[in-house]
Amino acid sequence: MASRLLRGAGALAAQTLRARGPNGVAVVRSMASGGGVPTDEEQATGLEREVMMAARKGLDPYNILAPKAASGTKEDPNLVPSITNKRIVGCICEEDNSTVIWFWVHKGETQRCPSCGTHYKLVSHQLAH
């Protein structure tokens, strides 16, 4: 029984020594700054990391955020990004409306919603590659 305890204690001591660096200070084996739980930025990889880095710079390369609403007048229309020369748009018209009014917006002049008269304008958009 005693030999089993001594063997376990010796293995634990050897493991502790291996975890220390050459100067005797314990090596942190975590990617987190400060040895705690990693932050979202430290743990994110791939597309998630790319989106987080772009958001930090104030960019939205994959159109994840809601579009910025304008006043909807002819002078200040709602901008509709599109990679083609037309796009279908849905207008709710009123806050408590239960139906969506769908219509096509074509490149060029601003177009109005047939129901409420809100103006929309198609703008060219390039995909992020």
From Swiss-Prot:
Q: Which residues carry this modification: N6-acetyllysine?
A: K68, K86, K121
Task: Tell me which UniProt keywords the record has, alphabetically.
Answer: Acetylation, Membrane, Metal-binding, Mitochondrion, Mitochondrion inner membrane, Transit peptide, Zinc
Q: Where is the transit peptide?
A: 1-31
The family database entries (PROSITE patterns) matched by this protein are listed as: COX5B_1, COX5B_2
Give a single Pfam family match. COX5B
Q: What is its main location?
A: mitochondrion
Tagged with keyword Metal-binding? yes
Gene Ontology cellular-component terms for this entry are: mitochondrial inner membrane; respiratory chain complex IV
Name the residues that bind Zn(2+).
Answer: C91, C93, C113, C116
Copy the pathway line from the protein's UniProt record.
Energy metabolism; oxidative phosphorylation
Localization of this protein? Mitochondrion inner membrane
* Subunit structure of this chain's protein: Component of the cytochrome c oxidase (complex IV, CIV), a multisubunit enzyme composed of 14 subunits. The complex is composed of a catalytic core of 3 subunits MT-CO1, MT-CO2 and MT-CO3, encoded in the mitochondrial DNA, and 11 supernumerary subunits COX4I, COX5A, COX5B, COX6A, COX6B, COX6C, COX7A, COX7B, COX7C, COX8 and NDUFA4, which are encoded in the nuclear genome.
User: What does it do?
Assistant: Component of the cytochrome c oxidase, the last enzyme in the mitochondrial electron transport chain which drives oxidative phosphorylation. The respiratory chain contains 3 multisubunit complexes succinate dehydrogenase (complex II, CII), ubiquinol-cytochrome c oxidoreductase (cytochrome b-c1 complex, complex III, CIII) and cytochrome c oxidase (complex IV, CIV), that cooperate to transfer electrons derived from NADH and succinate to molecular oxygen, creating an electrochemical gradient over the inner membrane that drives transmembrane transport and the ATP synthase.
Q: Which family does it belong to?
A: Belongs to the cytochrome c oxidase subunit 5B family.
Protein name, UniProt field: Cytochrome c oxidase subunit 5B, mitochondrial
